[in-house]
Amino acid sequence: HQGGAGATLMPGMCEAHTHFSWNDAATLAAIQTMPLEEHVLWCAKVARRYLEAGFTSCVGAACAKARLDVVIRNAINAGQIPGPRYLAASQEITVLGALGDETLPHLPFPEFSFGVNISGADEMRKAVRLFLKYGVDSIKLNLSGDNFTPQSPADTTWMLDEEVAAAMREVKIRGKRGVAHARSSESVKQALRHGIDLIYHASFVDNEALDMLEAAKDRVFVAPGIAILYAMLNEAEEFGITKQMATDMGYQIEWDAALESLSKMHKRGIRVLPGGDYGFAFTPHCQNSRDLEFFVKYLGFTPMEAIRSTTLYGGQIMMRPDELGVIKDGYLADLLLVDGDPLANLAILRDPKRILAVMKNSRSREFCVCGVKANP
């Protein structure tokens, strides 16, 4: 809705791939080794920054310690801290040697690991039940590898069907959601077979996987995280990763494959949402709306389709399609007032000076944290 003085009123945005506890570090170990007390404060600060940046809803995609997401969600809901509506995730659950296993031969202790390491269905069941006991909204499973960890590249698939089945049985009993780190084609198919409805990455997708995604498009969401691929190839040199190193790690191949796969998904009507794995040194927090620009530039979205992916689809992925994501009578007033027209220039959404006001259920910046800024 275009308003006076060239301002635009739009629904608040939704980040579909949120890691509040990623502390803008360059390695998984540097995230994991942040002491718990400082980590809680970090998450609270980042949650507030997301709201100020126009994100009134966020979907947790994994946290670095067992209860960080749950504690932050509960504090937001109780009015103790400002922040977006939040769905809390578990830590990443992984298998020995795969993405998230940061233990060392001489330090095999689980506390040293970024993810929770399991081997077999029984260990999976125990891990999932523990996170469900803590009160998470979703269980995160690392089905595929990742080029960030060269010993388990992105096109490999690590988890056994019986391990995934054990996890999803517990998830479904509690009425919660299973989400998957799934870069490989086989891991995407595995996620779909087991009823996982939120798939992160989906970089390598063959025709069979595309057909399966399309058949399940009424229940499935894909949040690809292409910002991290772009950043690793083009913006990580100051952190010791040159373009050639990133290419040797497999990022150029994955970038090319991801753009092809995600463009095909979009054309087939599969819901692709922004969520770029922000919270690393090369993808710092609160540049998240940059994903919308990438969607237009690389995936064939129109600017309006990009906006809808973070608003209309945002309400759907938050499981509140009749309350969020649209400006309409009867919906919650999660609103964003922007200086200018995002459809003409999506980049204004990541310029703090252009965010004039954020309202979460009619409360300006929640508790009037920053008030409503007026142009001089």
Predicted regions and their residues:
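Divalent metal-coordination and catalytic microenvironments
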Residues: 6, 14-17, 54, 86, ...
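His/Asp/Glu-enriched, well-ordered alpha-helical/loop segment
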Residues: 173, 244-246, 256-341
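Active-site core of metal-dependent hydrolases
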Residues: 142-256, 273, 278-280, 299-301, ...
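C-terminal cap of metal-dependent C-N hydrolases
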Residues: 310-312, 329-375
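Metal-associated gating/positioning segment near the N- to mid-region
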Residues: 7-74, 96, 162, 191-194
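Histidine-rich, glycine-flanked metal-binding segment
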Residues: 1-10, 371
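Active-site mouth loops of central-metabolism enzymes
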Residues: 28-41, 103-126, 177-179
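Divalent metal-dependent hydrolysis catalytic cores, especially in the metallo-beta-lactamase
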Residues: 44-72, 82-92, 136-149, 176-177, ...
